[in-house]
């Protein structure tokens, strides 16, 4: 087992990475201080892993309740969140009750938001079961739900007590879900570590095949990068914004198509190819770097051609973004491979990227 610590002073917590973690009661024990835990999971994950986690926590002498929600991004709503609150109130959960988020990013985000809100804050543990949630969404304390006009627009910062990333759970992921997680792995290399990006390039075939050792390496590499960024900028007032590389385009794709039509990682993957293209158009990176980002995204079985939402619609959707200020869209771009920054962009270059992205992969798009 590998442990990476998120250094946030009194809110610091460990991220445990390994196999067989779901059954290890000793990993849960330090973080469930009350007498009760509530596992929040979904209809897909519950039959696979809920009994294992429940047994581990019960072995500590704790009372365990379970909330099983429908699966999918389209259920990341107020209505679904209220089902968690209803269950907590019905079970008599108090301020010492620990919530356990067992599932992917949707479950982690909603459980974390419920924990941040219930009785003004209760502890929770992240047990991510998808690659995307293990390398990204379970780390850093961002929680929330979607609004019809924008993704993750309603939420709170609420750090978990611990993260247990069990690599065994990745073996049951459908190929599309695995690919979606690879988008965030690639993102971390692109924005912060060129050597890590090159490692992903060398091992992409094995990663696509879900090789356990390579997956552990990818989770560790990504978590180390994200933990370092979060430790420096917990509330996204500066540096942490670079973790949104590809997300301004990606969130617009998700909202424009309807949440759940594309997986979050698929939209981010396409968004990274678009952001790399825009970085090149503005003269920050050379064509080879742009092509490497797009080629690796494609090699990870992610889309690199954007849906044709229309340029005006795309821009309107991107204005509903947490980075936007006074209606001005901000993008995370690459200054070079492994170094990202936040900036505004000229309208003509943005429109050029949008127009070419829906016609052909950015690697094939002529640059004006």
From Swiss-Prot:
GO terms for cellular component: cytoplasm. Its EC number is 4.2.3.4. NAD(+) binds at residues 71-76, 105-109, 129-130, 142, 151, 169-172. One of its GO terms (biological process) is amino acid biosynthetic process. GO terms for molecular function: 3-dehydroquinate synthase activity; metal ion binding; nucleotide binding. SUPFAM superfamilies: Dehydroquinate synthase-like (SSF56796). Signal peptide: none annotated. Its cofactor is NAD(+); Co(2+); Zn(2+). Gene3D superfamilies: 3.40.50.1970, Dehydroquinate synthase-like - alpha domain. Keywords: Amino-acid biosynthesis, Aromatic amino acid biosynthesis, Cobalt, Cytoplasm, Lyase, Metal-binding, NAD, Nucleotide-binding, Zinc. Zn(2+) binds at residues 184, 247, 264. Catalyzes the conversion of 3-deoxy-D-arabino-heptulosonate 7-phosphate (DAHP) to dehydroquinate (DHQ). This is 3-dehydroquinate synthase.
């Amino acid at each position: 087992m590998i442990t990476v610590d998120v250094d946030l002073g009194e809110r610091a917590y460990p991220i445990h990475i390994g196999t067989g973690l779901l059954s290890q009661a000793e990993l849960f024990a330090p973080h469930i201080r009350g007498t009760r835990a509530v596992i929040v999971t979904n209809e897909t994950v519950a039959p696979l892993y809920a009994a294992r986690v429940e047994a581990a926590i019960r072995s500590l002498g704790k009372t365990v309740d379970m909330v099983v929600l429908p699966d999918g991004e389209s259920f990341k709503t107020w209505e679904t969140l209220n089902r968690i609150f209803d269950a907590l109130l019905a079970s008599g959960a108090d301020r010492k009750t620990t919530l356990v988020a067992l599932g992917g990013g949707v479950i982690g985000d909603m459980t974390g938001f419920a924990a941040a809100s219930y009785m003004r804050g209760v502890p929770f543990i992240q047990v991510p079961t998808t690659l995307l949630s293990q390398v990204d969404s379970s780390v850093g304390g961002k929680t929330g739900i979607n609004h019809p006009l924008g993704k993750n627009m309603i939420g709170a910062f609420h750090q978990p007590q611990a993260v247990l990333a069990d690599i065994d759970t990745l073996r049951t992921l459908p190929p599309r879900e695995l690919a979606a997680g690879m988008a965030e792995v690639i993102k971390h290399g692109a924005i912060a570590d060129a050597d890590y990006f090159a490692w992903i390039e060398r091992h992409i075939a094995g990663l696509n095949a879900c090789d356990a050792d390579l997956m552990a390496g990818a989770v560790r590499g990504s978590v180390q990068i994200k933990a370092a960024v979060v430790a420096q900028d917990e509330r996204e007032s500066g540096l942490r914004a670079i973790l949104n590389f590809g997300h301004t385009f990606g969130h617009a794709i998700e909202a424009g198509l309807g949440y759940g039509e594309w997986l979050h990682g698929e939209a981010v993957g396409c968004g990274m190819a678009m952001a790399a293209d825009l970085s090149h158009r503005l003269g920050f990176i050379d064509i080879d770097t742009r092509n490497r980002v797009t080629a690796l995204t494609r090699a990870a079985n992610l889309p690199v051609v954007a849906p044709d939402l229309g340029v005006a619609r795309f821009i309107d959707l991107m204005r509903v973004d947490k980075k936007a200020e006074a209606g001005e869209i901000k993008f995370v771009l690459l200054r070079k491979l492994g170094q990202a920054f936040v900036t505004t962009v000229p309208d003509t270059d943005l429109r050029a990227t949008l127009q070419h992205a829906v016609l052909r992969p950015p690697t094939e798009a002529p640059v004006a």
